[in-house]
From Swiss-Prot:
Family indicated by similarity: Belongs to the binding-protein-dependent transport system permease family. OppBC subfamily.
Domain of life: Bacteria
Subcellular location: Cell membrane
UniProt cross-references to Pfam families, sorted A to Z: BPD_transp_1, OppC_N
GO BP annotations listed: peptide transport; protein transport; transmembrane transport
Species of origin: Lactococcus lactis subsp. cremoris (strain MG1363)
Primary location group: membrane
Membrane topology listed for this record: Multi-pass membrane protein
Gene: dppC
Keyword Protein transport: yes
Record-annotated disulphide pairs: none
Name of the protein in its database record: Dipeptide transport system permease protein DppC
Amino acid sequence: MENLNKDFTLVGSKGSDSTEKIAKPALSFFQDAWRRFKKNKIALVAMWIIAITLVFSVISAFVVPQSKANYFNPNKSQVYGNLPPKLSGDLPFWNGDFKAPGSAEKTDVYKAQGVPEKDKYVFGTDKYGRSLAKRTVVGLRISLIIALAAALIDLVIGVTYGIISGWMGGKVDMVMQRIIEIIQSVPNLVVVTMLALLLGQGISSIIIAIGLFAWTGMARQVRNMVLSYKERDFVLASKTLGQSTWKIAVKHLLPNVSGVIVVQIMFDIPSMIMYEAVLSAINLGVKPPTSSLGTLINDGIASLQFYPFQLIIPAIVLSVLSLTFIFFGDGLRDAFDPRASED
């Protein structure tokens, strides 16, 4: 009997502690969001394009300053003006050949205008002989500065307004939301155009005009999130402990609505880039000779019939830039709020 007791073991008792251990550590909110974001390949590619574009824009400020992109020699405009893109004579689009309107054959414009063989322009030149590649680089940088600066105004006003409206509630919230409805009842483009007319041309004028009326969407998104979070246990506990409203907003509410803020900013930036392009199209953009993507497109429209490449190239850059922000924002939205993508 003693031998039986010695040999007796409880089934399943061995290794019970090891089976109850968690195999992996719990992921934080942002770690889980990054895990979901990596599955969206289009958004991941868009993120890298945006990162490369931002780094390129910063570096280009030292390599291609505005003065270099704006400079031209009036005495050589006939030689270097309106040259088509050229890299090599073997490439179909970048060979320097161009078929003039009404002509049946293509001609080597570089030879016809007496351009030295060593001079090649990857995006061609404008009517003054300025390199479109340099002007596109500067235009990309200016458009990004305008969009990001306007987005910063959108961020500050929209988040502050939304937190105050959602936190206060009641009549204060009702009045603040009616103000937003009044602003949104007028198309943003009309308001931005009128404000740009009052402020005049210039980068700062465009930033103010766009930023002052682009925050309403951000404010509503933040307000809705604050309304849902302010009755949560961790907020009520902070109130009970006597924490100030400002501390609760910064320490508890703002981190929880940060996902919505980032997503909204990513969707606002393409709109701001388009606003700048529209303002430039009606001569309310940056002051000449400074270039932006909008001014380049506006100049290209004037010469579309004869030199379509002057419009096509900046239009492609503008479209790709806007789409990358849209795809990136879409990926962030699905990562931060997977339930929204399932719906």
